[in-house]
UniProtKB/Swiss-Prot annotation:
UniProt keyword annotation of tRNA processing present: no
Chief localization: secreted
Protein name: Allergen C-C
Entry coiled-coil feature ranges: none
Keyword annotations of the record: Allergen, Secreted
GO cellular component labels: extracellular region
Subcellular location: Secreted
Keyword Electron transport part of the UniProt annotation: no
Family: Belongs to the protease inhibitor I6 (cereal trypsin/alpha-amylase inhibitor) family.
Amino acid sequence: SFREQCVPGREITYECLNACAEYAVRQ
């Protein structure tokens, strides 16, 4: 999920960016 993949201090990965995009779309 967004919170699981995009947490402070963790490297920004392609999967993270995808999760962020999906999270934004659902809001």
